[in-house]
Every structure is written in structure tokens, then in C-alpha cells.
Curated annotation (Swiss-Prot):
GO CC field: host cell cytoplasmic vesicle membrane; membrane
Keyword terms, alphabetized: Host cytoplasmic vesicle, Host membrane, Hydrolase, Membrane, Metal-binding, Nucleotide-binding, Nucleotidyltransferase, Phosphoprotein, RNA-binding, RNA-directed RNA polymerase, Transferase, Ubl conjugation, Viral RNA replication, Zinc
Binding site for ADP-D-ribose: 10, 24, 32, 112-114
PROSITE patterns: MACRO, RDRP_SSRNA_POS
Record PTM text: Polyprotein P1234: Specific enzymatic cleavages in vivo yield mature proteins. The processing of the polyprotein is temporally regulated. In early stages (1.7 hpi), P1234 is first cleaved in trans through its nsP2 protease activity, releasing P123' and nsP4, which associate to form the early replication complex. At the same time, P1234 is also cut at the nsP1/nsP2 site early in infection but with lower efficiency.
Source organism per UniProt: Ross river virus (strain T48)
Segments forming domain Macro: 1-160
Cofactor(s) listed: Mg(2+); Mn(2+)
Name of the protein: Polyprotein nsP1234
Amino acid sequence: APSYRVRRTDISGHAEEAVVNAANAKGTVGDGVCRAVARKWPDSFKGAATPVGTAKLVQANGMNVIHAVGPNFSTVTEAEGDRELAAAYRAVAGIINASNIKSVAIPLLSTGVFSGGKDRVMQSLNHLFTAMDTTDADVVIYCRDKAWEKKIQEAIDRRTAVELVSEDISLESDLIRVHPDSCLVGRKGYSITDGKLHSYLEGTRFHQTAVDMAEISTLWPKLQDANEQICLYALGESMDSIRTKCPVEDADSSTPPKTVPCLCRYAMTAERVARLRMNNTKAIIVCSSFPLPKYRIEGVQKVKCDRVLIFDQTVPSLVSPRKYIPAAASTHADTVSLDSTVSTGSAWSFPSEATYETMEVVAEVHHSEPPVPPPRRRRAQVTMHHQELLEVSDMHTPIAARVEIPVYDTAVVVERVAIPCTSEYAKPIPAPRAARVVPVPAPRIQRASTYRVSPTPTPRVLRASVCSVTTSAGVEFPWAPEDLEVLTEPVHCKMREPVELPWEPEDVDIQFGDFETSDKIQFGDIDFDQFXLGRAGAYIFSSDTGPGHLQQKSVRQHALPCEMLYVHEEERTYPPALDEAREKLLQAKMQMAPTEANKSRYQSRKVENMKAVIIDRLKDGARTYLTEQSEKIPTYVSKYPRPVYSPSVEDSLQNPEVAVAACNAFLEANYPTVASYQITDEYDAYLDMVDGSESCLDRATFCPAKLRCYPKHHAYHQPQVRSAVPSPFQNTLQNVLAAATKRNCNVTQMRELPTLDSAVLNVECFKKFACNGEYWQEFKDNPIRITTENITTYVTRLKGPKAAALFAKTHNLVPLQEVPMDRFVVDMKRDVKVTPGTKHTEERPKVQVIQAAEPLATAYLCGIHRELVRRLKAVLAPNIHTLFDMSAEDFDAIIAAHFQPGDAVLETDIASFDKSQDDSLALTALMLLEDLGVDQELLDLIEAAFGEITSVHLPTGTRFKFGAMMKSGMFLTLFVNTLLNIVIACRVLREKLTNSVCAAFIGDDNIVHGVRSDPLMAERCASWVNMEVKIIDATMCEKPPYFCGGFILYDKVTGSACRVADPLKRLFKLGKPLPAGDTQDEDRRRALKDETDRWARVGLKSELEIALSSRYEVNGTGNIVRAMATLAKSLKNFKKLRGPIVHLYGGPK
């Protein structure tokens, strides 16, 4: 069974799909459980007689009652009774499987009057576990004894615990074994001797490569064919190109690739493949442990593997691949050595000890703008004896005692000097190929120190010049310099000791800079504490538990130093294939071995099948509107330079309890009414068990005499952070009535605007001030229609829960032409909106109510959303950005260069944006949708959804109409809100918007760079577009702007702007009560870790404090950032936010 729980309460009050009765063979009413069942479902005893050791299903009074007859141990032997008890439970399990019952309430059989006077709780419980493990039902065990409850709970806990066989073994379930030459060696979570041998390497730069390699192995089941494709992938071929070569359309879910295929230097690990691919390598070497087809593959050379790994569970500890040997005494003790290596080749390559050369360095300065910082692969240690060469000024971090700075600002003339070497280590060096150049690592200079401290990342310094290194062969290497003093005499350095390596030099030369041409991993970028389930798709993120609102794959960045236009290419999706037989097979596997991995595989297949069925249903329902896919208009999208930010320096406390206390101290100092807020849990939730109530929009009546029982049981963890944020609303009658009573829509308009004239002016302003004037004719000639591809793409991209909801809604589907598009449903929003402040303690939390559109309208028409977004991005001016399909990193790349200290930024906050959209704005939206090319047939449907709303006054039956307003949760809500947001900015700002270097819009949120408000802006909004607007003038670095739940801050170290989450909002959210049994804390912790890493950037710390003090007028914000970093460090720390479980209404006494 997926889950076992125990409850100490009356079984007749259960909420499960079926109940098991501890019956007797005659089918008559007895005592205990039998009497409770008879009292609640009296008809269930008709024809209930069944022999001992069997069970019988009776459906009565709307309930599935399973009568199971256990043995009476007073009348049978122990062995016979034990057999019959097991048989009774097996019979119950058989009925559950045959009837597809998903949850069952069950007592322990033969533990009461049939127990023969002995304690048979554990005996009965073991048989129950054995039988129920073969079912797919959630099992709730009911008892009335406190000692029994404790025993059963301990037994359930033991089933989920991990037992250590030996005391010597340390439990490291998330340890991953990596290649000895991997850069992950020594980092937490990775080992060269122990751990899992298959992983997607989540949280590293090699994750995407690992996922791609796993997909290739799935597309080509034959190992040699898959390896051939992996070689082509390493040589630069794209995944799309590889997928098109696959002979079959669909493939199974992938499994993680090997992390250690072998121990030789040519092991084709995800890390090596990633580096080869990143360096645009044209020829690679693979070893024999990576089998390939017999024929030759261009650019791939095969060698014999000299260190085959036999996968044994007890791996001997490996000898370090490096052995340091003493060097011969140098005659020039005061000369500096800078190493260059001749022998290189694969991503694993190390310098050979026979190829070290001594270089004499002469400084000579050249001035020009550098490209990107050079790779820093091997550190040449240079000890300075005569003078301190370099001084780094204006450092924003504590200076470490050992600082390493690249010597770039020099033209280095290399003279080869023979190194004294014993014949034991002298190896022949193959002649270098003419086409390639010897790589020279970037030399570094080290300041000598008498003591050691932990290293601190050095800040980036703006570069002003470039230099080159010239070898005796006349080959130049460009190096990008950092801030460096010009030297007037040669630098004398000491030769580094040679290193013995356990392999032969490799006969391949790699271009300088081959190793790391992409940006470096910054300290704090990777969370090595991530919990990996062991397969893709293990986490389905929600907004609170995953990376925030802007979470997508980065698609708007590139490694070039300037903005470039690219042809917009749709990400290819693979339609789900229906395979019910495989779903049943995976379900059976999961039942036999109920591990997380098996459960995940089964759920993935189940969701795929659901999606396939949904697509067929929707295509069938929309067939009168369905058309062939027309040729898409090519559009272009800008990509921006990948920004560089200062490194994160961890600043946290040791004790998480101190961190919680620091959060509460901050709240007490800045929000005293919040910290001291007290509320009684059992306030007034009794209205949800009322009989005979009459509920209307404006009143509710009931009879207090008809109160039947306590409210439903509600349990939650008492929050330790005292931010007094209420938990989500319970779906009780009282709250639903409050919601129904609250929804007093704006039934009268403030005044009648000239609807048509206003809409035409809105559209003209939009096209004049926010658009580039292209594409309108092409859009008109190529209308957007519902196509098979639209529907398929939309459904394929749905996450599991959304797919399940749509699957339920499309059952007995109404055709699109019969969907009532003008209908909307008043729905209750369960979550309480969290805003930092005291409002939530000064008044009772109000139930938020939304007007949801007809679900089927959303299901049919969501398919056109992607094409609408693509077209809108194509027509908008290059300075205006919408955040659709964009990651947080993409947004950072867009704003990085534009937002500088002292720049003015305009924020506008529109009150009740959805409700304020009247007829003129609805018409504006329809006209713009028509201009973007939406087909006339679809426009008719959308017009019905956007138009006037018809309502009925329930007490009198009076029908009335009121003006249009946007319905939340509709198929185009976010798109149209964003469109109208830009329209309003165009009407009010006009040329100021056009001339702004950067403006961003999403929904009702916007920021416009370089604009200051004037006294008429708010009045124009009120009179021209009927919107009540609050205008905020922000200034970078003084009062930083706020957008999308975060601040736009300026990184003082790198000179780039970025958006970071609001720490105060995050702190308030940590005080939200969590329902008992929630299992998403690891996701929440990881999401918080990502945010704390950004807050810890060296160049942002002071900026963040300015932002919080200017926006919220609070002090001591450094303490809460430090406290949240402590809580995010580990799951154990994060759990300190959760106090004891509070039970309301009917919990354990």
C-alpha cells in the first residue's frame, strides 16, 4: 500500500472509500467494531454471512462494507488460527484490488473477544501489512486503545526506517561516486570510493549533459549505437539533430548515466563530455570501456582502457593519482617559473612531468579592450622574494592572507630551459601537430604569508588592457588582464616541482582556452546538499517549493559580449503515447517493490497516458474549429550577454534555533503587534457541520439545535517564526458563505466612457509608442487558429496535477461550439496573501474570491497562447520586455547593463486591476487580438468571454447585467492583462516609454527605466482608462525599485544589475502554519537556499539593506538574511521552523 496510518477514534466516523468489519461467520451483529458498523450502516448485514478466513463485500447505505471473519483463537489451535487470520486479510486485499478501492478503514482482526485472552496486536498487524502490501489502497488502521495506537505507529515507523547492518557503515544515501579526476572530488555529496554509480548530477554544470546522455541511451537501446551518438554530441551536434535521427517517435523515460564508466583518463563521463562540447573540440579519444561500432567514426580515436573498473560494492580506497617527488636543487633560486604543458588532449588532461619549462617574464603594457577572462585551469605557484609586486585596492571583502592574482598585463617571452630530470621520469614527447597550439595555463602570483586563513573570493576588477604571451616558437596567446602594476624589471620566480602522473602523455594538442570558455562556476552557485531521487522528473515544483515565479530554462542569454538577434525556434515537444499495458506493468512493479523510484516511474507513465487521452478528447471536441497547421511566420528574438555577478560568501549561524530566535527578535523590534499577536485556534469553525441551513448571497440562516458533532479534524505544525500569518482557509461552509457574501462585484460603472473611441485611441497609442511597426500585415494574412499541434503542445507541457485536473474536466466532454463562454464561476482562493506588515493582524484575514472562467474554455483555447506570446514579442519595440517564457537569469541578463546607480525608475501599482477593466479596455484587448491575427471564429468565442456579465439576484430572481471585467484563471488572463498594462503605459507616458532604455511588464506589474512621475499621471489614468493608480518613483541604489516580488539591485563589484527576492516577504512566509503530513520541506529549503545564495553576493549586501530600509523602514535586516541562510543549509536546520503538531477538533487527546 502507498501509505499506512493509525487513528484512535470510532471507525464509523471514517472518511475512507471502504470499511472493513470484524465480522463473525453467521453475519450477525456483535460487539466492538461490529456494533459501530451496524449502527452506522444497518443494511450492510443483509447476506453478510461468510466462512472463517474469508471476506465478503456488501454495498449498503452508500458505503462499501467488507465483512472479514477472523478465527476465534479460543476454539482453534495457534497454527490453524494463524493460517486463517492470514487468509482473512488476503481475502480483504483481493476484494480491494478487484473493486479498485483507493482507501480503506480497517480494524485489527481477532484482537478483541476472538483473541483467546492473548495480546495479538503485532500478530494481526503483521498479517495486515503482508496482505495490504499487495494493494494500491491507502490503509488507515483504527483502534480505541492508546497503547495499541503507540504500538501500531511504531510498527509503521519501523517499516519506513533504514536499518544499518554494520555499526561501521555510515549512512550516506545521497553520496555519488565520481571519477578521481573530476572537479567534484572533495565537494560534499561526492566521493571517489563510495556512493551511487548512476546520477543526473543535479545541481552541477554537467546536469544537462547527463540528462542528454541518458536520453540518447534511451533513444538507442543498443549500447554501441548510443555511444556513437554520444560521441557526435560531444563533438558539437545538437540534441534536436540527434533526436531526428532516431527511428521511433516516442521513447521511455531515461535512467541516469554512469558517473564512473572506468578509471582511465578517457572515461566518457558527463563531465568530460560537457567540457569537450563546451570547447568545440574537433577530435576526441575514447577508451575500450566505451564500446563503439566496428566502423570508423570521424573525429573519434579509440584506445585500450588501462584502468577498467569492476563494479564491486566494496570498492578499495584508491591511491591518489598524483605523487609529488622532490625536485633537483635549482641553481637560480630566485627565478620565477611559469609552467606550460605540451601534453594535453582530453578534458581529463594533466601536464606531464617531462614537459615543464621555465619562463623569464618581462613586463610590457598594451592597451585595448579585452574579451572575457581567461580559463584558470592549473595554478602555477610563484613565490615572490624581492618585493611585493601587486596591491589590490578598493576591495569589498576581507582580504585573505593568501591572494592569487593573474599576471596578464605583460607580453611574456618564453625561453626554454632544460629541467634536470632523472632518467626514471624522462619520457619521450611526441612532436606537436602543426594545426594546434600548446596550451599555457594562466600564470598566477602569490603573496607570501606567515599564516593561513580560509580563502575568500577576490572581487572582480574592471580591466583596461590586454596582453599576449609569445613562446620561442612565435605563437601568441591573448590574455585578459586584471588590474596590475607595470613592472620595470623582469620578475624572478621559482620553478615548480615536477609531478609524476600514472599515465602516458596523450598525443593530442588542445587550443589555449579549450578547458573553460564558458563562465566559471561561482562560489555559492551550486547546492551540493540537494536530495536526488534518482531519476528525472522527481520534483514537481509549486510556487512556494520551487525556484520562484520566473522559472524556465534560460533562453535569452549567450556567451557573446553584445546583444544579438536570433531566429525564434520553438522548443520541440514529443506527443505522449498511450500505453495502458505498460502502466499496469509499472503499477504491479510498484506494488511488489513500493520504492520512491518505482512510484515515480508509475506516476510518470500514468500522467503520459492521461495526456494522450486528453489530447484525443480535445481534438474530438474542437473538430469543427480544428484546422491544419499553417506555415509559421519567422520571428526574431534578442539574446543578451550572460551577466557576471560577485561571488556569494556564506554568512550563517551554527545553531538553527538561534536563527529562529533572531527572526523573532527582528519581528519584535520592527513589528511589535505581529510578534505579540495571539489567537485562539478553536475560534468559530462550528458552522461547517450545520443541517438545514439556508444560504444566499447576502444572508445565511440555520438552527443551532441541529449542531451534530465537532468540526472536521485539522492538524498543523505550530510555526516557530512568529509572523502571525494565517494558514490557508479550510473549505468549510462558514468560509464558503463568507466568500459568497463578499463577492459584491462593481455592478455600476463610475461613468460611461465613450467605449469605441477610447478603444481606438488605446490601440493607436500602443502601436505608435510600444511597437516597431512590422509584421501587422503578415499576422493578418496568417491567422491564429486551433490546430492539432497547438492542442498537443499545450497538453504535453502540463505538469502532473494540472493534467489530472484537466483529465477529470474533459470526461463527457462538451464540444467547443456548445461551451458557454460567457459563464464564470465564483471560486474561493484558499491561500492568504502574504505582504510584510501588520495588516493581517489588525483585521481578520479576508477570503479572496476569484471569478474563474469556464474550465472547458480554458482547456480548448490555451493552445493559442504560445503563438500569441511569440507574435507579441515580435511586434514590441526592443526596449519593451514581457516576462513570458523567461527565466530569472534571462531577466537579469536583460536588465544587467541598463540599471546603473542613481537611475530613475517608475513603478505603477494599479488597484484591483482585473475588476477595473471596463468595456473600453475589453474592446481594446479584442482589437489587439484581432491585429495579432486571432481567427474571426475564435474572436467570437473570446468576445463572449470578455463581454458584459449577466447575473441573477438569488433572493428575488431578478436578472441584471454589469460591465465587462477580467475573469481570473481564464485562458488569456495573464496575456491580456500584460497587453493592457503596456497600453495604459503608452497612453500615460507616450514618448517617455518609447525613449526608455528598458521597460518590463507582466500582468499588472511594471517598471519603466529613466522616467520620473509628474502630477498629472495618476489623473490621466483615472480619467482616460478608469484605473486607480499609485505611482512610486524609485532610484537605483537609493530606493531600489520593486518588481515581481523582488528588488532590482546593483552589484557594486561587477557593475551589473539583478533582481533578488524580497527577504522580508520570505521571512513572513516562513511563519505560515504547515499542515501535518506535508512532505515538501526539502523543496522549500532548496528554494530558500537559492535565494540566500543571491543575497550573500559580496556586491549586494549593502544594497539589500538600503532596499529594505527604504521600502519598509526596518532595521537589522542583516540578521534575518543570516538567519535564513542558516535555516536553508540543511533539512535538519529547516525543520526547526516547525514546532509541535497542534490538533484541532477531534485529534488525539
